Amino acid sequence: MEPVLTEREKMVTGLRYRFEDPELDQLRLRARRLNKQFNNLIGSDEDDGKKGPEIIKQLFGSTGEIVIVREGIKVSYGVNIHVGDKFFINHNCILNDDGPIRIGYGAMIGPNSQLYTATHPFEPSERIGGSDENFTKGITIGDNFWGGGNVIILPGVTLGNNVIVGAGSVVTKSFPDNSIIAGNPAKLIRMNIPTK
């Protein structure tokens, strides 16, 4: 007999799941509260430079030691976000982490960028009325990533180490290590082989 998976387990593994679920409702509420707490703190008189990173460590599933997050961040669950050490994300970014978002060491994400893992059936009858039939495709980003401002990364994308994404790009497919990509949809501009 196959094990019965929770809606959360289905969600993070890319299986179809019901969005309206008590456990998922609680996780979304927790994320909204921590999100609000963080965004209200940054730049306020109470911002001592220590409380913000503590909130992010509570909000994200896992983080490296040095994590810098600017104000205006929005997440769906938070717990499905895993970032490496020396991670930087600029202001007003959206991390739609219905599915896992994994980002390696030394990543930099520009302002107003968006990472989406949620997707929906192509069949119209399966989407009508906000159907419970949702599914996810995780995003994986390697070490030393640099994404310019207003970058959008769509569900299921994997980007290798040392990838650079030009500002305003929409990344619809995966690219290997050392790729420099840009455009809508993003295309390979050239390879960037590190010299050090």
From Swiss-Prot:
SMART domains named among the record's database cross-references: Mac
UniProt entry tagged with the keyword Calcium: no
Record GO terms (molecular function): acetyltransferase activity; O-acyltransferase activity
EC number: 2.3.1.-
InterPro entries assigned: Hexapep (IPR001451), Hexapeptide_acetyltransf (IPR051159), Mac_dom (IPR024688), Trimer_LpxA-like_sf (IPR011004)
Gene3D superfamilies referenced in this protein's UniProt entry, alphabetically: Hexapeptide repeat proteins
Top-rank EC class of the record's enzyme: transferase
Keywords: Acyltransferase, Transferase
Pfam families registered for this protein in UniProt: Hexapep (PF00132), Mac (PF12464)
Family (UniProt): Belongs to the transferase hexapeptide repeat family.
Name by which UniProt lists this protein: Putative acetyltransferase DDB_G0275507
Source organism per UniProt: Dictyostelium discoideum (Social amoeba)
Source species taxonomy: Eukaryota, Amoebozoa, Evosea, Eumycetozoa, Dictyostelia
